[in-house]
Every structure is written in C-alpha cells, then in structure tokens.
Regions:
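Non-catalytic helical tethers at domain boundaries
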Residues: 1-151
Length: 151
C-alpha cells in the first residue's frame, strides 16, 4: 500500500469513527444514561483518531484529539459526568474534527488558507472549553470566533 492509499484508508476510517461518535452522542443526548459502554466507545473513537492522525503527521487533528482524549479520560475515571453540556461540547468537537478532515482534501492554497484560519479560530475556542472542563470547570460556550476574511 502506498502513502496515498494509506491516506485514503485513514480518511475513510476517520469518517466512520466520526459517524460512530455522532451516533453515540445523539443517542446520549436524546436518552441520557451515561453508560460505561458509551463512555468507553467515545474514548476509543477519539483515541484512535488521535493515534492515526499522529502516524500521518496531521498535527492539528492530533493535538485537538489529544485534548478531547484527556477530557474523555476524566469522564472514564469518574471525575467528570457525561451530562448534556458535555455532550453538546463533544458534538461541536466532532463537527470540528470533521471540518479538519475536510481541510486535508482542499487543494487550492488560498481556499485552504482561509479555511485553515477559520478552523484555527474555532479550534482555539473549542480547546478553551475542553481545557476548562479538564481543569474542573463547567461547559461555558465561548464566543463565536470571527471568520477570516477571504484574501
């Protein structure tokens, strides 16, 4: 398998993992139970995405997934509860990971630069929420980031 084929497998598998994450979170949102199986599954999804992104050098994805993994580890350890606020944060984080994956397929430099700048702003905002949760705070949605102007 050459590098482009391996990258395609990565993209496909991450897409499936993100779909799984979304299904788990939507189920938890509509029928909150905080079951160990759900928590473990969410942790594994984020852990796998982090590791796979690291193998390919997709640092932006790996760093973001690392903080999500740390948060999910706190949930697994019983330090955090999988409540509605956390589910909503994880859904937004899942969408952000999906957008980061889409950026990998953008070929035009100017479009990639604008999209990347917008995603950087979004990532900064989400990471502040994730890190606040890790440090013991509640989920308080950060202000919407300003979109970068097209160049």
């Amino acid at each position: 398998m050459d590098l482009s084929e391996a990258r395609e497998v990565f993209m496909q598998e991450c897409g499936e993992l993100l779909d799984r994450m979304e299904s788990l979170l939507i189920e938890e949102s509509t029928n909150p139970r905080g079951e160990r199986e759900t928590i473990d599954s969410l942790f594994r999804v984020v852990h796998t995405i982090k590791g796979s992104a690291g193998i390919f050098g997709f640092d932006r994805i790996e760093r973001f997934a690392h903080d999500l993994e740390s948060l999910m580890d706190r949930v697994r350890g019983g330090e955090k509860e999988l409540n509605q606020g956390l589910v909503e944060l994880l859904l937004r984080s899942r969408d952000h990971l999906s957008n980061l994956m889409q950026l990998l397929n953008v070929r035009e430099e100017s479009a990639a630069a604008v999209m990347g700048a917008n995603l950087d702003a979004s990532q900064t905002s989400l990471l502040s929420e994730v890190r606040a949760m890790i440090d013991g705070g509640a989920v308080v949605p950060a202000a919407k980031p300003q979109a970068a102007a097209p160049s």
